[in-house]
């Protein structure tokens, strides 16, 4: 905060000498001057008249008060900052074991609303065999232990696509898919519960989703302790790297008793949408269920497996980003198009697409959507927002602070909203590698509802290759479908798939984490700041005007006395 030194000013009156006129004063006092008794009026003509000095004091006080108001308005301009707290930490047990070649990816990160230090991460493992992993911390992410996920009886031991969420009563729910056969097709979706923050899991219960339920996601209503939702893509026939038919819908089911009983499935995506993928659910301010997904339009390259599972140039058409919303707990749905001109930036296997991210500010009701987009010539992170009660989504905001069209990719964003309204975005970032291969992980934060963002904070303390993972031999290395992010008023907890301990040969992937701390100094409201600055300026002008008036009166009095 700046300081102001006060200066004491002496306002002195220059002495004025009037020439004597040579009149001699008689005894009777007839020679009195006009200024009063004893002929002293000639000397008094240069003194300030009564009321002049108070005007000068008032003028100085007004100017000083105005300057003080402006200083107060600027004293709250301390810049907000974000800083990484400590080194990266691997979450999975086998990260430091060179014999453990597990490909861990697609992490989900959740927090117990009843115990702030209780964090849980669920992730899938693609190789050397399909499986799932659950990691639990009770000290805010400092130490992690692994909890075994129980295998359902009668199913092949191939767990896939786990997800996790805490209910408002602190119950942890974990969903996962079991795969079947040489094609590794989804056979069933299961749900386990934990009453102790993830230390133990109950025997799994089969959900009604059935076989060929892809891209399953789990969410919970924070206002109803046992209300949970599952969203998924209901597929028909499968082929190699493809759904054999179009028209596979996105569906949703609800349980109001923690997964014991379920509603009938309802269709989320409209019947005219023939190629939809990657449903991402989130609960809104009024407990409405929101589902963000991609409509691939005519993209048969990815949806139809036209690339035959090999990397190369992305689809050259456009996708739509769509939000479906239900205000009656999933019974009926209304859609809004977030953006109808999303430019694809990569190829993908349709069974495991990159997911867009959705977050809702439960205080303001604003919904935020994020995804990568190539309209500027390379992959950039874009953000869209929909204010509560608004009919249309905002124009996209480019989040990453790289030079436009620099040829590097920023992609797979994950959003989170802190209780104080701060919006955080974490994403993979190749800005430091002109060959566009090595990843870093970056986080950017917005304090004005996504209009502007702080400069990026690098979370990963080492760059790592984006070409390590399952599918690398086909130039389609899979780092997973998402990153994980949690936000509190003064922290952000981020997790991602990290390949620094792997190689093209081993395909080893680990789950790494980082913590970011924020300083959020007290701020004046924009109205208060404007009032102080405008009011201060007016006081300064008024003080200057008063001083000018005082000086003018002094000069006038001096001329009159002369």
Protein language model regions, located:
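Extracellular, repeat-based ectodomains that mediate carbohydrate processing or recognition
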Residues: 48-562
């Amino acid at each position: 905060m700046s300081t102001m030194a006060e200066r004491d000013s002496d306002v002195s009156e220059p002495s004025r000498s009037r020439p004597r006129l040579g009149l001699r004063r008689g005894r009777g006092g007839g020679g009195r001057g006009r200024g009063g008794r004893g002929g002293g009026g000639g000397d008094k003509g240069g003194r300030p008249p009564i009321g002049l000095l108070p005007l000068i004091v008032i003028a100085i006080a007004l100017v000083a008060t105005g300057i003080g108001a402006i200083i107060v308005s600027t004293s709250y301009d301390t810049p907000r900052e974000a800083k990484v707290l400590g080194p990266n930490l691997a979450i999975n047990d086998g990260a430091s074991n060179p014999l453990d070649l597990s490909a861990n990816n697609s992490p989900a990160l959740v927090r117990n609303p009843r115990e702030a230090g209780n964090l849980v991460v669920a992730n899938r493992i693609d190789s050397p065999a399909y499986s799932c992993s659950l990691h639990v911390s009770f000290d805010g992410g400092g130490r992690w232990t692994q909890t075994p996920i129980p295998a359902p009886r009668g199913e092949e031991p191939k767990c896939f696509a786990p997800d996790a969420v805490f209910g408002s009563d602190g119950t942890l729910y974990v969903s996962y898919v079991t795969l079947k056969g040489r094609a590794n097709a989804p056979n069933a979706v299961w749900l386990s519960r934990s009453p102790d923050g993830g230390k133990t899991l109950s025997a799994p219960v089969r959900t009604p989703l059935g076989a060929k339920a892809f891209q399953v996601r789990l969410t919970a209503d924070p206002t109803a302790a046992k209300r949970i939702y599952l969203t998924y893509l209901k597929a028909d026939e499968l082929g190699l790297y493809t759904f054999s038919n179009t028209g596979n819908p996105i569906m949703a089911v609800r349980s109001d008793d923690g997964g014991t009983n379920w509603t009938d499935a309802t269709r989320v995506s409209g019947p005219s949408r023939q190629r939809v993928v990657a449903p991402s659910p989130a609960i809104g301010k009024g407990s409405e269920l929101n589902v963000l997904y991609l409509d691939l339009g005519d993209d048969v390259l990815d949806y139809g497996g036209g690339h035959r599972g090999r990397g190369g140039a992305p689809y050259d058409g456009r996708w739509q980003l769509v939000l479906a919303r239900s205000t009656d707990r999933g019974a009926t749905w209304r859609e809004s198009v977030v953006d109808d001109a999303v430019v694809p930036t990569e190829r993908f296997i349709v069974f495991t697409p990159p997911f867009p991210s959705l977050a809702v500010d439960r205080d303001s009701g604003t919904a935020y959507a994020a995804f990568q987009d190539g309209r500027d010539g390379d992959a950039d992170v874009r953000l869209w927002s929909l204010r509560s009660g608004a009919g249309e989504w905002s124009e996209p905001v480019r989040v990453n602070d790289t030079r436009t069209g620099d040829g590097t990719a920023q992609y797979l964003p994950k959003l989170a909203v802190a209780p104080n309204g701060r919006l955080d975005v974490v994403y993979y970032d190749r800005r430091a590698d002109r060959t566009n291969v090595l990843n870093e992980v970056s986080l950017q934060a917005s304090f004005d509802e996504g209009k502007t963002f702080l400069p990026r904070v690098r979370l990963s303390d080492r760059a790592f290759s984006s070409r390590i993972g399952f599918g690398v031999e086909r130039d389609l290395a899979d780092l997973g479908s998402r990153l994980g992010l949690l936000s509190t008023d003064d922290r952000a907890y981020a997790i991602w798939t990290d390949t620094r301990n792997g190689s093209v040969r081993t395909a080893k992937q680990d789950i790494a984490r980082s913590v970011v701390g924020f300083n959020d100094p007290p701020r004046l409201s924009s109205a208060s700041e404007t009032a102080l600055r405008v009011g201060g300026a007016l006081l300064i002008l008024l003080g200057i005007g008063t001083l000018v008036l005082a000086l003018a009166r002094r000069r006038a009095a001096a001329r009159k006395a002369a």
